[in-house]
């Protein structure tokens, strides 16, 4: 596996490769990331991964400086997965001058849910993903469903800019107790780690209640999500949202949508101590 930081060297290395499968990451790799590499291999060859902690998507009070950076360990993991190239640019490589041009997602998708609580986050994501796509020129790119809203935004961006890349969704990888794998799980204390799976269990309860009552016309979505928020707060969580949305556009479902069996997803973000976790579950 070649480790490359220069954009020009990367382009030289990939010249003539017309079926590149790309997995962008911020490093501190875990089994969830590695599952993305394996899925990428099913859809293209060679597999290219990137590691870049993108300052543009961190807010002023977020964890950019303390975000775990474990490059050597990440390299060893990627080598075992047969990754062809790791693109690991420095900030100077990616942004040799101030990044004055930004890619901003539409407000109806970028300013809700995560976008409401992390202003500017998706603008930073879209900008760096567009630049990475320009550098790598992939034919396919794999994004995890754990970041459900990000997946939808990137997919819509690729479609509206007519980018020659297929966005492949990857299922969320979970620990045995249900907690979605995340680099930020490392911030949890032992006590918090024991409580953390409750977030997924709460989503499961929302899903079950939706199927048993809301879809039968016996309760409202608002009643179900309010109960979930109350449950999390009662266990010491600080939830930002528990929201049931249409899978197609992440807008709230209408009664007509529910009656017609529109595919839905329940999404949540909540702090446990100082660590903010996100998760989702399709209904």
UniProtKB/Swiss-Prot annotation:
UniProt binding sites for beta-alanine: 57
Note: The reaction proceeds by a bi uni uni bi ping pong mechanism.
UniProt keyword terms in alphabetical order: ATP-binding, Cytoplasm, Ligase, Nucleotide-binding, Pantothenate biosynthesis
Designated name of the protein: Pantothenate synthetase
Binding-site list for (R)-pantoate: 57, 150
Record GO terms (molecular function): ATP binding; pantoate-beta-alanine ligase activity
One GO BP: pantothenate biosynthetic process
The family this protein is said to belong to: Belongs to the pantothenate synthetase family.
Location of the active site: 33 (proton donor)
Assembly, per entry: Homodimer.
Pathway annotation: Cofactor biosynthesis; (R)-pantothenate biosynthesis; (R)-pantothenate from (R)-pantoate and beta-alanine: step 1/1
Catalytic activity: (R)-pantoate + beta-alanine + ATP = (R)-pantothenate + AMP + diphosphate + H(+)
InterPro entries assigned to the protein according to its UniProt record, in alphabetical order: Cyt_trans-like (IPR004821), Pantoate_ligase (IPR003721), Pantoate_ligase_C (IPR042176), Rossmann-like_a/b/a_fold (IPR014729)
Keyword ATP-binding: yes
GO CC annotations, alphabetized: cytosol
EC number(s) reported in the record: 6.3.2.1
Source species, domain of life: Bacteria
Compartments in which it is found: Cytoplasm
Cysteine disulfide links: none
Binding, ATP: 26-33, 144-147, 173, 181-184
HAMAP family, alphabetized: PanC
């Amino acid at each position: 596996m070649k480790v490359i930081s220069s954009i020009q060297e990367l382009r030289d290395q990939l010249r003539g490769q017309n079926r590149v499968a790309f997995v962008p990451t911020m490093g501190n790799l875990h089994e969830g990331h590695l599952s993305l590499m394996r899925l990428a291999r099913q859809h293209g060859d060679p597999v290219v991964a990137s590691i870049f902690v993108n300052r543009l998507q961190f807010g002023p009070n977020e964890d950019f400086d303390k975000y775990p950076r474990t490059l050597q360990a990440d390299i060893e993991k990627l080598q075992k997965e047969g990754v062809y190239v790791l693109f690991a640019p420095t900030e100077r490589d990616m942004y040799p001058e101030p990044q004055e041009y930004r890619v901003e997602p539409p407000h109806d998708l970028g300013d809700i849910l995560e976008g409401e609580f992390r202003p500017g986050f998706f603008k930073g994501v879209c900008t760096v993903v567009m630049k990475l796509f320009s550098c790598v020129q992939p034919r396919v790119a794999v994004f995890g469903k754990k970041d459900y809203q990000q997946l939808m935004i990137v997919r819509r961006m690729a479609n509206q800019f007519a980018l020659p890349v297929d966005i492949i969704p990857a299922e969320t990888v979970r620990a045995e107790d249900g907690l979605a794998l995340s680099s930020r799980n490392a911030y949890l204390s032992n006590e918090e780690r024991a409580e953390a799976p409750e977030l997924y269990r709460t989503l499961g309860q929302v899903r079950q209640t939706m199927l048993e009552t809301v879809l039968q016309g016996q309760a409202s979505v608002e009643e179900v999500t309010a109960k979930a928020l109350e449950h999390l707060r009662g266990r010491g969580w600080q939830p930002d949202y528990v929201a049931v949305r249409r899978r197609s556009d992440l807008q709230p479902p209408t009664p007509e949508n529910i009656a017609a069996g529109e595919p839905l997803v329940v999404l949540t973000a909540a702090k446990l101590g100082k660590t903010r976790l996100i998760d989702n579950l399709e209904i």
